[in-house]
Amino acid sequence: VAKSAADRGVLAVLHPHVGTMIETGDEIQQVLHGSSISLCLDTGHLLIGGTDPAELARQAPERIAHVHLKDVDSTIAARVQSGQLTYSEAVKLRMYRPLGQGDVDVPAIIEHLWANGYGGWYTLEQDTILTEEPRDEGPLADVRTSAEYLRRVLGQLH
């Protein structure tokens, strides 16, 4: 797939994601060892699937072509992994946290990718499920918190 896409001027990128064929650490390792396709480092879905995204950034920085930054409460993620909660239930319980308020080592990921010449995009994601109109700013407040955190982390790289 990667070669066929490249022959057409397109970069194919695999996005490991909860609830798909490529979710767990073993499945990601199979992709890394059995193909040349680039990866989307989705910090949230990797952590929920049992992969340390900072370790993956250290292990295979040359394979990372896109990054989705989100933070995760690993206690809730463990309940998804064990089958105690569905993914949707976990999202409703605020499994996804503003950057810096969860268990993803965002600074280590950014620092390692930066040191290895990563020049791609970082997408800030704040997944949520709203069942009613949010009070005050709702998820917008989380996005602002994440953006401020990201500015601080990036400011420390220079």
Language-model features: where?
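Short active-site-adjacent structural elements
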Residues: 77-78, 130-134
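Soluble or luminal CAZymes and related metallo-dependent hydrolases
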Residues: 101-105, 142-145
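Short acidic/histidine-rich active-site segments
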Residues: 123-129
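Acidic/histidine-rich catalytic cores of soluble enzymes
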Residues: 1-103
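A structural motif corresponding to the C-terminal end of an alpha-helix
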Residues: 1-12, 107-119, 152-158
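Alpha-helical elements of Rossmann-like donor-binding domains used by nucleotide-donor carbohydrate transfer enzymes
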Residues: 27-30, 108, 145, 149
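C-terminal helical cap(s) of enzyme catalytic domains, especially alpha/beta-barrels
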Residues: 134-158
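Residues at the N-termini of beta-strands
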Residues: 66, 120-121
